Amino acid sequence: MGLTEGVFLILSGTQFTLGILVNCFIELVNGSSWFKTKRMSLSDFIITTLALLRIILLCIILTDSFLIEFSPNTHDSGIIMQIIDVSWTFTNHLSIWLATCLGVLYCLKIASFSHPTFLWLKWRVSRVMVWMLLGALLLSCGSTASLINEFKLYSVFRGIEATRNVTEHFRKKRSEYYLIHVLGTLWYLPPLIVSLASYSLLIFSLGRHTRQMLQNGTSSRDPTTEAHKRAIRIILSFFFLFLLYFLAFLIASFGNFLPKTKMAKMIGEVMTMFYPAGHSFILILGNSKLKQTFVVMLRCESGHLKPGSKGPIFS
């Protein structure tokens, strides 16, 4: 094992550990709260489910990383690759849609518009979110089912490639695989568009609210303004981290067709782990209960608060 492989394994292991800790923290805090009160808000439910999916996603990515390093032939074999791709695709798409649903929920609860359509959605926010979550599940199943044709084409052109008979038929099949693989990325467009729309509405709502505050001569740092800013930070961070994740996903997916196949796959795998860990940490900072518990935990660790003291999770 060379220096590059060693650095790859260290980075993968570090990001995996941090991601697991962050998402398990969310599970522990929200799970403890639900256990005590037997109630869970819609936003907490989405965040908790999202954290669980990201734990699974991180495990899939780590497994993929170790197979790339220690058993590349097994990784590229038909059945193993298909199991990883199916698990990754379903978990990945569902987690992205849940993050999108969270952005829509924040938008409907915080933004203020007088348009009849927006008011209709705002008054029925719980029902809207239930339908969005069901739609997210169906779309995630659809994106996973779309892999069937991709698997068939991949099997055909890999079989031709193994014979080292690079014919026009081989080039045609490879082009078809490229096309289907690229078209498969279009499943990412709907959640991105919805997230961008939620972000835009919150920006417009914040601008109008700020102008009203200035006209009334009141402070612009009121709870409504802070809620707008917090939601905007969460949605914007998801948007940019997802773009980075999408780039990494493309690098990892098309690694077989790049000059330095193994290096491309390793870079892609390391980059993909940053999103499920980074965005979950931002969710902690944007959620008052999670943030307070996190601060209390840090104070306990640093010795500024006695372990017996009651923080948000114990109260």
UniProtKB/Swiss-Prot annotation:
The family classification in the record reads: Belongs to the G-protein coupled receptor T2R family.
Q: Give UniProt keywords alphabetically.
A: G-protein coupled receptor, Glycoprotein, Membrane, Receptor, Sensory transduction, Taste, Transducer, Transmembrane, Transmembrane helix
Give this protein's Gene Ontology molecular function annotations. Answer: bitter taste receptor activity; G protein-coupled receptor activity
Q: Which gene encodes it?
A: TAS2R3
Residues the record marks as carrying a glycan: 165
Mapped to this chain, the residue ranges on the Extracellular side of the membrane are 1-5, 63-93, 149-185, 255-265
Q: Which Gene3D superfamilies match?
A: Rhodopsin 7-helix transmembrane proteins
* Lipid bilayer topology: Multi-pass membrane protein
Q: Which residues lie on this side of the membrane: Cytoplasmic?
A: 27-41, 115-127, 207-233, 287-315
Miscellaneous comment in the UniProt entry for this protein: Several bitter taste receptors are expressed in a single taste receptor cell.
Known role = Gustducin-coupled receptor implicated in the perception of bitter compounds in the oral cavity and the gastrointestinal tract. Signals through PLCB2 and the calcium-regulated cation channel TRPM5.
Name of this protein: Taste receptor type 2 member 3
Checking Pfam families in the record gives:
TAS2R
GO BP field:
detection of chemical stimulus involved in sensory perception of bitter taste
InterPro entries assigned: TAS2R (IPR007960)
- TM ranges: 6-26, 42-62, 94-114, 128-148, 186-206, 234-254, 266-286
Q: Where in the cell is it found?
A: Membrane
Q: Mind telling me which GO cellular component terms the entry cites? A: membrane; plasma membrane
